[in-house]
Amino acid sequence: MTEGSDGKTIDGMSLKRIENLIDALKDESYQPKPARRTYIPKKNGNMRPLGIPSIDDKLVQEVLRMLLEAIYEGSFENISHGFRPKRSCHTALIQVQKNFTAAKWFIEGDIEGFFDNINHDVLIGILKERIADDRFIRLMWKFLKAGYIEDWTFHRTYSGTPQGGIISPILANIYLDKLDKYMKEYACQFDRGDRRAMNLEYKRYSRKIWWLGTKLKQTEDKDTRKELIDAIKQHQKNRMHLPSVDEMDEGYRRIKYVRYADDFIIGVIGSKSDCEAIKEDIKNFLGEKLKLTLSEEKTLITHGNRKAKFLGYEIYVRPFTDKTLRGEKSGVLIKAYGKKVVLEVPMFTMRDKLLYYEAMEIHQFEGKAKWKPTSRTKLLHLDDLEILDAYNREIRGFANYFSIANNSSHLNSFKYIMQYSLYKTFARKYSTTARKIIAKYRHHKDFAVFYEDKKGGKKMRVFFNGSFKRKTTAMDASCDYVANTIFNTTVSSLIQRLKAGKCELCGATENIEIHHVKRLKDLKGKEPWKIQMIGRQRKTLAVCIPCHNKIHHGIID
């Protein structure tokens, strides 16, 4: 159970504690605690600060989040995908893939230290545009100014959203919704022309086809007709591989914009000088209206046929020849030229992830880098099932995130390294060889670990054997929108169980509070409270104070 800065956890939560919280909110005596700062590793090797709020602050923030979502969610723009219901990185990427097909340039947006640099005065001003409740605004001010504790020292916060706060994501969306609406208005001013001018070469072939078709109607000679038909087919074939419009038409401009949290990408049909002007305008808007800084170095302008980066993917536009595009009735080839946005998982991302997991080493051989699977020292203390689960979880998570990549089959390389790293980890754990481990754990075609469940039944779990077939829609790929999990149950469910006023162990009806465990799999033994929690697959149990004390002292019947 993770403690906040006040040392409290959800364990011991009761209706009385909630009622005291409500009273403090009513008389405005409630004061958020400073978050306890810790650090988690970033993928680039640096450390990211993370604030852990108190459990009371988590409760209050969850209520605030629900209120803010009810007020703002319906007014957010369709191009915003971060931290929103039924939206994800995948929905953002698929929107790029559908809407950026004609882009000549990409602008990769990067805001310097966004979450730490949200201006409090600007944020409160934005909230006041929709919220007239002064008590709500004063409470928001308290959270923004709550600060954090690091190495037993209190630090004030002068900018940014609550450290590790549940409300931080929606506050970020409310803040950057101003940018979204600015870009929507900007597109209306920037866009020019109803359609591109026709490609002159395409037009020339069309005229030849029309002229030959006219002659064909006037000719009855079989040989002449055959020659004309062959010529028409050849011209049609040549025309199919050309764009029907002039892709360099200066009279036609478009801009497309997609954002996920503080990452955004812009597709531009226009010139590079147009892109430079757009970048400068966004920089000025962010600085003047939102007091944010657009990174000059990281906000890149990339040609459409070169790889831009967005949400961990590499993105570029390429022509394609699709000879399956035929008329529904005639079966005649009607179009063979087009462009599409390609999403790819970068090889360097696979490399960095495998190195981060310490699942491989890189050796130089004849001037080339060779990836070599290796055992993982940090997993050796785990049992067989825990090691297998760790590998499966890592492979599944990585494969799921990159499942919409056009080159998703490259994930087989990732799986191969992880698979042989697993073999070597088992081999090192048992002081044997990978070959012997494979023979020992093979079950049919799978690598399998057998174990007993809580009831003593024999179970089997196998190494990841899923497919890396590309998913084409966000509905196929798991959504990465993370629900706010203060508890494993919802706040309302927890409060309802407290309001029921009955101990779930002995049936007592007074002084009910919540017992909480960190992980269900750590529960061993046949005590009634453990059986109940395991049976319900629930980390929380509503119990009376005497039963709760007995649980903690290990003396419950």
For the regions a protein language model found, what residue spans apply to each?
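Non-catalytic terminal/accessory segments
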Residues: 1-557
